[in-house]
Amino acid sequence: MAAVQATTGIQANTKTSAEPVRPLANFPPSVWGDRFLSFSLDKSEFERYAIAMEKPKEDVRKLIVDSTMDSNEKLGLIYSVHRVGLTYMFLQEIESQLDKLFNEFSLQDYEEVDLYTISINFQVFRHLGYKLPCDVFKKFKDAISGTFKESITSDVRGMLGLYESAQLRIRGEKILDEASVFIEGKLKSVVNTLEGNLAQQVKQSLRRPFHQGMPMVEARLYFSNYEEECSSHDSLFKLAKLHFKYLELQQKEELRIVTKWYKDMRFQETTPYIRDRVPEIYLWILGLYFEPRYSLARIIATKITLFLVVLDDTYDAYATIEEIRLLTDAMNKWDISAMEQIPEYIRPFYKVLLDEYAEIGKRMAKEGRADTVIASKEAFQDIARGYLEEAEWTNSGYVASFPEYMKNGLITSAYNVISKSALVGMGEIVSEDALAWYESHPKPLQASELISRLQDDVMTYQFERERGQSATGVDAYIKTYGVSEKKAIDELKIMIENAWKDINEGCLKPRQVSMDLLAPILNLARMIDVVYRYDDGFTFPGSTLKEYINLLFVDSLPV
């Protein structure tokens, strides 16, 4: 979570200095204020949507298991179900159908199938964890030149499908590497000549492919941009809209709860130098899991991440190096007695932090899940130590080597705190074995963590350099390998691209853990892309995040 320095700001007296020199910041204020505090959940309306979903839900279930439906039509149906965020409702039925179709797969069956249909089939299998071979696309390449046939460039829907398919590639799938570059260029060259829904679909995909987008937002956009696909099955379209309205009410209530909690904590009074970003943080966490059963998990993870913003901005944009050392020591002790050693301005935060974790710990202990709270707390302590190391580097003017930077940078990216805190309220899914797998730092987790660090760095390095803060991965790479700034950025982008391939592979069957545990790992990488692909969307949330918040919580979907 990068910050941008200004020359003016708040100063406060502390025990260490009457007028300390601070790395002051002047963050843009919240664009929302108390807007979401006034929401009132109509429980009867909420219940009506739940009841109204039952009939179309059963109708869609029957469609999914319909044995008379053509396989391509069936996969097209499942694709739409997945795009509107309903896979979790029918996972058993969908996997039963896909198991059968995958086992019957033959490359010869695709010889007479068009590019768009093959792309839809490929995406369905890959999204749901089945490693359909990328050889299904070989027939679209010229056998002599090895390049894609010029004939596919007249099939915009087919090219769009291939471009989306390419985002699901793993290492070694050269044909999809080539497709991604080739098709992106072709789509960019024709997008302004297109009209209607197809134009919007291409623009949406070029801006951010579905696989790298926020699931709830992608579902919402699907209603608008894929009207024909949605309306081909009336029961699915009806269920999807009712489901979205149901989620909207639940999530507005959750946003109200965390907004009130934040206001009650008085952070804007006790630490007024921080970024006020409650809806943005809630959106971030919502991006990890939107399913109704994770309501408590979202509330807990949002609260902990809001604590993290206070800590981050205190270290990065307010505290002196002496205060940072004292605060880090207090974080290591994690005891109320340590409050006397830290500056007065941060004491209310420290007390609330300890109290809230204790309260969450008690609640989870009753469910036999205290270990997830301990993991979250330890990650919080780790990031404080990481922030201290960054501060010491800045204070001494030290630029770390790239390996040294990455070792600490993966901690200070905040990925570890957010991802472990996301596990706290997930329930029985996070078993002792599942948590042990997570703590083993598996490859998909490493990849998502790397994306979190480097995507942030690529977007914010200039800001950080201007404000005189610690060197980013871009600076460390330049120093270590003696390359130009452009070369460093290009190399980091390749690392990000390969990390996506590793995540994709980690989500394919056979998996070490359930997709329920892998989904937040995948989705956190997606949210990093949402926040940092085009700008520092967290510090300056007036663009993408504002658009998304409006889309989900302000501009209601008509039913």
Swiss-Prot record:
Transmembrane segments: none annotated. Mg(2+) 3 binds at D456, T460, E464. Gene3D superfamilies: Farnesyl Diphosphate Synthase, Terpene synthase, N-terminal domain. It is an enzyme of class 4 (lyase). Pfam families: Terpene_synth, Terpene_synth_C. Keywords: Lyase, Magnesium, Metal-binding. The keyword Metal-binding applies. It comes from the Eukaryota. One of its GO terms (biological process) is diterpenoid biosynthetic process. Its EC number is 4.2.3.23. Its cofactor is Mg(2+). Pathway: Secondary metabolite biosynthesis; terpenoid biosynthesis. Binds 3 Mg(2+) ions per subunit. Mg(2+) 1 binds at D312, D316. SUPFAM superfamilies: Terpenoid cyclases/Protein prenyltransferases, Terpenoid synthases. Mg(2+) 2 binds at D312, D316. Sesquiterpene synthase involved in germacrene A biosynthesis. Germacrene A is a precursor of several sesquiterpene lactones. Monomer. Belongs to the terpene synthase family. This is Germacrene A synthase.
